[in-house]
């Protein structure tokens, strides 16, 4: 029996979401479109299999096939990133971060991460998150004028507080991160270095963004975003930490791994090993830079003045529109992105003074620099006259046409 016949309510909602994805331009930096092959693996009967433990060391029978699948995922990830150790079992990037913390830290230990207010992530020490509740968290930020990472401040805080772990990585930072400089201060004070590369993983795999492999003690990531795989987590590390990380993921922190998701991760890693993936990631950066340049020429302020990766922030204060209102305005024209705090944002987190723009999904659709320049101009047109309903409707129609020209999936 088909899903349509058995559960028409869910089938209709899936169809509605499919239609939304096909008819909206996706600019959320943390979203992407997986391939049909990744969808097939994730939607497979592997979802039926329980496999607590690790290949060759399971607590259930019947795991010979899924052992091969997990080993293949590990092998491909090691080849992709050139690392010594890989764990593909984390269910998410946040859980990968938690696992690393639990592996080598004790409650109350000091950590140093990037401030959420300056582009960091909740799991890097925010007070509302487990990382800020169970550990004594200190945060570094950006230089006021350049809006780039303040390495001097980070080093001063490290020497003052002597954290047991320093975290490099961000969720809304558009510039290259100097991982060797983090390593140097960690060595000076005797701290672990963890790099959260969730946003940059695909770029790193393709060699278009500096790699922390061989520099950091621990590297965590999601497997979606720029890596263009299923939603899930990943841990890379030096071989000396293999035993403690394996034990922390299972049995300390998780139970059975999601074998259908691990299979989908393996497919995504295989895709990322191909030459086309490398070309794709360079196009992602080119498209982001093109959009940032166009918006700058249109009079909007790009935080830090540009981008070295797949995303950037727009400061909307001069436009007299909040990030929340801009998000809603753009969505009414079928352009999807997210409100985002700018450095030292005077607005509340639910309102914000900025928006974040990312190009992974547009690039997956086949958009090049010309199309991305047009989209940037459409965004500027909307922000300049947010109350012009006729303009909004005209832009919505143009967006719909672009979506038709560049479908996400070739539906039959």
Curated annotation (Swiss-Prot):
First-listed, main subcellular location of the protein, grouped into a coarse class: cytoplasm
Binding site for (6S)-5,6,7,8-tetrahydrofolate: 116, 120-122
Site, as annotated: Plays an important role in substrate specificity: 224
Recorded GO MF terms: glycine hydroxymethyltransferase activity; pyridoxal phosphate binding
GO biological process, one term: glycine biosynthetic process from serine
Positions of post-translational N6-(pyridoxal phosphate)lysine modification: 225
Localization: Cytoplasm
A Pfam family that the UniProt record links to this protein: SHMT
EC number: 2.1.2.1
Keywords (A to Z) from UniProt: Amino-acid biosynthesis, Cytoplasm, One-carbon metabolism, Pyridoxal phosphate, Transferase
Associated pathway: One-carbon metabolism; tetrahydrofolate interconversion; Amino-acid biosynthesis; glycine biosynthesis; glycine from L-serine: step 1/1
Cofactor dependency: pyridoxal 5'-phosphate
Gene3D superfamilies from the UniProt entry: Aspartate Aminotransferase, domain 1, Type I PLP-dependent aspartate aminotransferase-like (Major domain)
Assembly information from the UniProt record: Homodimer.
Family: Belongs to the SHMT family.
Name of the protein in question: Serine hydroxymethyltransferase 1
Gene source species: Pseudomonas fluorescens (strain Pf0-1)
């Amino acid at each position: 029996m088909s899903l349509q016949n058995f559960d028409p309510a869910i089938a209709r909602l899936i169809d509605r979401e499919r239609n939304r994805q096909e008819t909206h331009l996706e600019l959320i930096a943390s979203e992407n479109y997986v391939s049909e092959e990744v969808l097939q693996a994730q939607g497979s009967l592997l979802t039926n299999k329980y496999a607590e433990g690790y290949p060759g060391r399971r607590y259930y029978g019947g795991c010979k096939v899924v052992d091969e699948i997990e080993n293949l995922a590990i092998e491909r990830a090691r080849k992709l990133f050139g690392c010594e150790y890989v764990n593909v079992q984390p269910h998410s990037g946040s859980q990968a971060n938690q696992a690393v913390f639990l592996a080598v830290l004790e409650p109350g230990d000091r950590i140093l991460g990037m401030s959420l207010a300056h582009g960091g992530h909740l799991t890097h020490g925010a007070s509302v998150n487990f990382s800020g509740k169970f550990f004594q968290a200190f945060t570094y930020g950006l230089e006021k004028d350049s809006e780039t990472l303040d390495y001097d401040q980070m080093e001063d805080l490290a020497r003052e507080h002597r954290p047991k772990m320093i975290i490099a990585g961000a969720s809304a930072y558009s510039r290259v991160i100097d991982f060797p400089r983090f390593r140097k201060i960690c060595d000076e004070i005797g701290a672990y270095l963890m790099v959260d590369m969730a946003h940059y993983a695909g770029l790193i795999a393709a060699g278009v963004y500096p790699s922390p492999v061989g520099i950091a003690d621990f590297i965590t990531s999601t497997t979606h975003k720029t890596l263009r795989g299923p939603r899930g987590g990943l841990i890379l590390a030096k071989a000396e930490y293999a035993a403690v990380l394996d034990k922390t993921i299972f049995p300390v922190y998780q139970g059975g791994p999601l074998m259908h998701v691990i299979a989908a991760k393996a497919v995504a890693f295989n895709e990322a090993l191909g030459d086309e993936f490398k070309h794709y990631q360079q196009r992602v950066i080119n498209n982001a830079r093109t959009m940032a340049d166009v918006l700058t020429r249109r009079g909007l302020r790009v935080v830090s003045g540009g981008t070295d990766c797949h995303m950037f922030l727009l400061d909307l204060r001069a436009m007299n529109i909040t990030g929340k209102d801009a998000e809603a305005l753009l969505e009414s024209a079928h352009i999807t992105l997210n409100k985002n705090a700018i450095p030292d944002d005077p607005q509340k987190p639910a309102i914000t003074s900025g928006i974040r723009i990312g190009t992974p999904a547009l690039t997956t659709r086949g958009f090049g620099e010309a199309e991305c320049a047009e989209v940037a101009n459409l965004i500027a047109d909307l922000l300049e006259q947010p109350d012009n309903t006729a303009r909004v409707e005209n832009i919505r129609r143009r967006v719909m046409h672009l979506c038709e020209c560049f479908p996400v999936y070739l539906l039959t």
